[in-house]
């Protein structure tokens, strides 16, 4: 069965379910291997366009880590990360603007066949930040302090799909790199979104990081601190889980870390309760 046939069958199967989502809002953070593989990229764009066709408001926030790292290496600089966050100096910011807000963003918009509108956190005052204050200095990494959704509301009202690069600006006009998972979460909170979806390169949150069979399919947010203390949530998973927890604690119904290596993972996260990544929720 070819990819087109598979997608057509999935569309037919999903019609009734997606009709129930009409008028609802989903924020998707797109990144990882699904941005590198041409085949996976195609299925992601198919999924996003299908949701749009059913009247579902979709906001796509993207990373671009591999492209940024490539740009850094071309400058003779080795990328550095601490706790999953990129250490960012002025040279890195320049690369982020060129690669993330430029090349990556516009190529994604092009794949959305006239339905996408390319934005970054600087545009329309969308994301205001301040320098992230931490025990370790991450450089020009921002902490989001305000989200102005005016430009997003205008785009969604025009039935467009905002495609947002994760950069932001402070009150002095200094540009910062901002974690894309955090951007997606804060935008989802500000929009009052119905669902937050974060794409990653693993099956989800694993009780044993070396065994995908140990997938934790559902996590109640009150468990998160314990899971961090146990080392189950660590490294790059920390900002992802923090983003999910933030969304849920702000009133969001469901946050979902999905396996971006699976074809049509976005659609499946809506259509199926089967083990597809890790769903975060709050016990009522």
Curated annotation (Swiss-Prot):
Keyword terms of this UniProt record: Amino-acid biosynthesis, Arginine biosynthesis, ATP-binding, Cytoplasm, Kinase, Nucleotide-binding, Transferase
Give the catalytic activity. Answer: N-acetyl-L-glutamate + ATP = N-acetyl-L-glutamyl 5-phosphate + ADP
Q: Which pathway is this protein assigned to?
A: Amino-acid biosynthesis; L-arginine biosynthesis; N(2)-acetyl-L-ornithine from L-glutamate: step 2/4
- Subcellular location per the Swiss-Prot or TrEMBL entry: Cytoplasm
> Which residues bear the site annotation Transition state stabilizer?
29, 240
Which Gene Ontology BP terms does the record give?
A: arginine biosynthetic process via ornithine; L-arginine biosynthetic process
One Pfam family, short name: AA_kinase
Main localization is cytoplasm
**What GO molecular functions are on record for this protein?**
acetylglutamate kinase activity; ATP binding
Q: Where does substrate bind?
A: 64-65, 86, 177
Reading the lineage from the top rank, the first entry is: Bacteria
Please provide, in alphabetical order, the Gene Ontology terms of the cellular component aspect for this entry: cytoplasm
The UniProt record lists the EC number as 2.7.2.8
- PANTHER family associated with the record: N-ACETYLGLUTAMATE SYNTHASE (PTHR23342), N-ACETYLGLUTAMATE SYNTHASE, MITOCHONDRIAL (PTHR23342:SF0)
Q: Which family does it belong to?
A: Belongs to the acetylglutamate kinase family. ArgB subfamily.
Known role: Catalyzes the ATP-dependent phosphorylation of N-acetyl-L-glutamate.
Protein's recorded name = Acetylglutamate kinase
- Species name for this entry? Haemophilus ducreyi (strain 35000HP / ATCC 700724)
């Amino acid at each position: 069965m070819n990819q087109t046939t598979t997608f057509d069958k999935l569309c037919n199967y999903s019609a009734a379910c997606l009709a129930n989502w009409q008028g609802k809002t989903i924020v998707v953070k797109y990144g990882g291997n699904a941005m590198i593989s041409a085949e996976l990229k195609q299925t992601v764009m198919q999924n996003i366009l299908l949701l749009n066709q059913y009247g579902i408001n979709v906001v796509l926030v993207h990373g671009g880590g591999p492209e940024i790292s490539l740009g850094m290496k071309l400058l003779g600089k080795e990328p550095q990360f601490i706790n999953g966050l990129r250490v960012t100096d002025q040279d890195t910011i320049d690369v982020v603007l060129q690669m993330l807000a430029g090349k990556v963003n516009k190529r994604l918009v092009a794949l959305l066949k006239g339905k996408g509108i390319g934005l970054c956190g600087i545009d329309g005052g969308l994301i205001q930040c301040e320098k992230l204050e931490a025990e370790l200095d991450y450089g020009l990494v921002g902490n989001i302090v305000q989200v102005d959704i005016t430009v997003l509301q205008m785009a969604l009202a025009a039935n467009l799909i905002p495609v947002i690069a994760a950069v932001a600006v402070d009150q002095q006009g200094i540009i910062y790199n901002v974690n894309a998972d955090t951007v997606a979460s804060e935008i989802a909170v500000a929009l009052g979104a119905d669902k937050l979806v974060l794409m990653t390169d693993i099956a989800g949150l694993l009780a044993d990081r070396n065994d995908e069979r140990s997938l934790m399919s559902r996590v109640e947010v009150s468990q998160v601190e314990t899971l961090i203390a146990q080392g189950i949530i660590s490294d790059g998973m920390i900002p992802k889980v923090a983003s999910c927890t933030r969304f849920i604690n702000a009133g969001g119904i469901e946050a979902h870390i999905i396996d971006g290596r699976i074809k049509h993972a976005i659609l499946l996260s809506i259509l199926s309760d089967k083990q597809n990544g890790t769903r975060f929720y709050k016990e009522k």
